Regions:
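Non-catalytic, topology-defining segments of multipass membrane proteins
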Residues: 1-109, 116, 120, 133-135
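Active-site-flanking alpha-helical
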Residues: 121, 125-126
Length: 136
């Protein structure tokens, strides 16, 4: 149950989807979420003081769920990037909407793109390193 907090990593892609789908002022939902909501949550919520033993750390590393969560970021990032670019190309958007969608895509690429690529780049398997290179 403690591991459910890691699903929070998908909140930026979700807000990016809202930015693209709803457009208008909602095009800035990722910007608002990343620079207002998340800092406020960090301010109000207590930081975990849990110290994991070496065995617990080793068990967490071996869990395939965390690997799958990392791998799932690749199609999510590319899917949202494609969806955003198609929307920018096909829809008649106001300039402020274009800026909002592009800003949201930039936040997505900076968080779920580069961070996941960096993490996968530390892995030893060829598959994981290839995923890392795709995201870079």
């Amino acid at each position: 149950m403690r591991d459910l907090k890691y699903l929070f990593a998908y909140s930026i892609p979700l807000s990016t989807f809202f930015s693209i789908y709803f457009q208008g002022i909602w095009a800035y939902s990722s910007v608002f979420y990343a620079f207002v909501i998340i800092p406020l949550l960090e301010f109000w919520l207590k930081q975990s003081s849990t110290v994991y033993s070496d065995q617990e750390k080793e068990d967490r590393i071996k869990k395939k769920l965390f690997d799958l969560m990392l791998y799932l970021n690749v199609p999510i990032v590319f899917g949202l990037l494609g969806y955003g670019l198609v929307t920018l190309h096909q829809d008649a958007l106001w300039t402020y909407e274009q800026i909002g969608i592009l800003s949201s895509l930039g936040i997505l690429l900076a968080t779920n793109g580069i961070n996941v690529a960096h993490e996968l780049g530390h892995r030893s398997s060829r598959f994981e390193r290839t995923l890392s290179k795709l995201l870079y």
